[in-house]
Amino acid sequence: MRKEIKREWDFELFFKPDCPFCLKVLNYFKENDIIKFPSYNIEDVVSGYENQDKLYEVGGKVQVPCMVIDGKAMYESDDIIAYAKENFLEKAKENKAKREENK
């Protein structure tokens, strides 16, 4: 069973652990403190098929990486990173500062 995390972001990310483009997005998020968001491994032994079905329902194809924001699927690692740079970096800095304050 997946442990529930406190969400800091209103998006979901679908990925495969061996996909270099997925790793590019995941590494960018980690490096920029964009953390605590729902992510779905579409190759997971337990929930992979369910995750693939969910991805297909939202985007009409099973392609990763895929970020779902406001119910819309965004593909391509460069597009996802560009969107994150424009829309997430300021909030990521604020979230990190709050976490540091609470230590």
Predicted segments with their positions:
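Short alpha-helical
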Residues: 20-21, 50, 75
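N-terminal leader/targeting and pre-domain segments
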Residues: 1-11, 92-103
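Local sequence-structure signature of Cys/Sec-based thiol-disulfide redox active-site neighborhoods
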Residues: 1-40
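Thioredoxin-like thiol-disulfide oxidoreductase module
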Residues: 43-61, 68, 88
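Short, compact, well-ordered microdomains
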Residues: 76-90
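Alpha-helical elements of the RecA-like P-loop NTPase motor core of helicases
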Residues: 23, 27, 53, 82
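Conserved beta-strand scaffold positions in the cores of enzyme catalytic domains, especially
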Residues: 39-44, 73
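A short, hydrophobic beta-strand/beta-hairpin element that forms part of a small beta-sheet core
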Residues: 63-75
